[in-house]
Amino acid sequence: MDAVAVVYGITAAGFAVGVAIVGYLYASLEGSEERSILAALALIPGFAGISYVAMAFGIGTVTIGETTLVGFRYLDWVVTTPLLVGFVGYAAGASRRAIFGVMVADALMILTGVGAVVADGTLKWVLFGVSTVFHVSLFAYLYLVFPRSVPDDPQRIGLFSLLKNHIGLLWIAYPLVWLAGPEGLGLATYVGVSITYAFLDLLAKVPYVYFFYARRQVFATKLLRDSGEVTATPAD
């Protein structure tokens, strides 16, 4: 087993920790009306973990011309990254329309990115440009659209800001890695880019679900407020 496969295996194990965190979150929110919605967070580390197991065994990885397309990497991204930005919108209290919009923009960013990987010449850079437009639109949602929906609750504001900045900072890194890699300008090797993506994926998803667990009082407090049992509590 080569170094990349070993890293993929370690990354998959890391995602198992993320699934466990969501399990603890679910158990801690018994009675909350948001419990079933937040259970869907398990799809983020869960699907990513399955994808990395497949990647470790070379499943779905194909060579197109001189390009290696790691199919499960992009399948993982098209499933999990819309959930990442969608749950930021959910934490902000955004409308379903806004949440759906940001998820679609994210999925289109990934799909056009896949096209840029397998295309050649001018078409490659046209598709990369289109993907970049969708990428920029995500920042518009995170920093312009969603903040207008956040309720005047210090705990909810704190959670939203944490998630928004976590995703925002990491989303800057991904296109830079792509540009540096073999699919872009060829400044970095396939091995280096693969390991970097694994690190970024783990960093993006496991701490993300932990933030929901660490700030779970946001959702528990909402339940108690609705029942009239407590008054507002200060943010952590």
Curated annotation (Swiss-Prot):
Main localization (coarse): membrane
Cytoplasmic side of membrane: 26-34, 93-95, 151-153, 223-236
Transmembrane parts of this sequence: 4-25, 35-56, 71-92, 96-118, 123-150, 154-181, 190-222
Pfam family, one: Bac_rhodopsin
A single cellular component GO annotation: plasma membrane
InterPro entries: Arc/bac/fun_rhodopsins, Rhodopsin_retinal_BS
Keywords: Cell membrane, Chromophore, Membrane, Photoreceptor protein, Receptor, Retinal protein, Sensory transduction, Transmembrane, Transmembrane helix
Extracellular topological segments: 1-3, 57-70, 119-122, 182-189
GO biological process, one term: phototransduction
Gene Ontology molecular function: any one: monoatomic ion channel activity
Family the entry assigns: Belongs to the archaeal/bacterial/fungal opsin family.
Name recorded for this polypeptide: Bacterial rhodopsin CSR3
Organism listed in the record: Haloarcula vallismortis
